[in-house]
C-alpha cells in the first residue's frame, strides 16, 4: 500500500476550490477531466467520518456539503496524487 502525502499550492488546478457560505461548503474543481488525466476521488473528512466521492472523466465536479469546523477536503488526481483544499 502506498502512503499519499497531501500537497497544497495556491492557484493549482489540482487543489479543490472550497467556498463557505453560511452553513454550506461549496466544492468545485478547475482540473481537466480527460481520459488520461482527471480527478478520481474527492475525500471529505469531518470529525470521525470519511466520505469518498468517485469520479470518471465524464463527470463535472461541483457540489455542496454541510459545513463543520473540523472539515478537510482532498482531491486525488490519477497522475499527480493527493491535494488538500483550503477554505476561502
For the regions a language model picked out, list residue spans one by one.
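Transition segment at domain starts
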Residues: 1-22
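Short edge beta-strand/loop segments characteristic of extracellular beta-sandwich folds
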Residues: 26-32
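Beta-strand signatures of extracellular beta-sandwich domains
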Residues: 41-45
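Surface-exposed loop/edge segments in extracytoplasmic proteins
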Residues: 46-54, 83
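Short strand-edge motifs at loop-to-beta-strand transitions and within beta-strands
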Residues: 59-63
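Surface-exposed, short loops/turns at beta-strand junctions within beta-sandwich domains
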Residues: 64-71
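Short, exposed beta-strand-loop hairpins at the edges of beta-sheets
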Residues: 73-79
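Edge beta-strands of extracellular beta-sandwich domains
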Residues: 79-88
